[in-house]
């Protein structure tokens, strides 16, 4: 129940009332018939009106966001073929509408392209585009046996542009006039030269069995401190909630 309370998004502006005990007699008029209305404002993280500009992915483009999505892949082509030694365009990017509240943004990547037990050297991977994104410590896998390096296979990543601390996410600051975007987590998936068709998950009539790399986005409204303390309490709470979300997501797809 506590986690559900933390996850519930809302900005509540509550007026704290200071009640003064007044004497009777000539001072009674000071409190007679007084009342104060407490105004509650519901937070918003709406879908942007436009898809991101493919050439300037932190800016809105010209294409309408008809599907009301918050997660975009402007360069992905359905049915893209995997060729060993080549790359496949895939560029996940998260956006929020003008006038939304600031938010912390996370992306979880699930890689189910090759069969379970396939060696890491045969597993498709990606590298981060820039420092707008960081891996969440202890929550990612690389294609190295010791989990080192920057060729990522799967895991949880956080938006980190100008973050206040190395290990914490940064706010995606909303703009009152235009949609804003995180920039792309990565731009392509590399298909290892060592991979062959017998390594790939066999396609069946069940789409859940198809070779896929699935990207999920988690957007957590800023200002929710939870039980955390300190100047970066809301960032720490967002990170903790994202880890729970990613773990639930991973377990639900096993």
Regions found by a protein language model. Name each.
Residues 7-26:
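Sec-dependent N-terminal signal peptides of Gram-positive bacterial secreted proteins and lipoproteins
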Residues 2, 29-254:
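Surface-exposed, hydrophilic segments of mature proteins
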